[in-house]
Amino acid sequence: MERFRIIDLPKIVDPRGNLTVAEQMKNIPFGIARVYWTYDVPSGERRGGHAHRTCEEIVIAVSGSFDVTVDDGRGHKEVYHLNHPYQGLYIGTGVWRTLEDFSSGAVCLVLASELFDEDEYIYEYDEFLEWAASPSPSQGGSV
């Protein structure tokens, strides 16, 4: 089971402007419980810096670009450069993520499988590594 990967969303090209659609349980592999976005990120700042115990997410650069580093805590780490509004990065449960190198005017849209719950976040990297090293039925995700 892939813990993170690029998902191509449909891109409908039209001379009046392009359109991309995200539909839960169709091209988004989970039910969408929460949508949020970050914008006006100052140069050099980072976002993220945490993992989710139970929440899955799709991260989309709806405008501009930024890099997302994902880490499964078991030696598999990748950096994705997001710059297309018709592509999303699926991040399953139990994956540490850091977002950085935001371009001017970048907007990061996130589709989440769960409502906000402070208790399901892991904010300390060392705690994340310990958690990732122990087998857990909540690790994985829909993809």
Indicate residue ranges for each PLM-predicted region.
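Well-ordered alpha/beta subsegment
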Residues: H84-L89, T93-D101
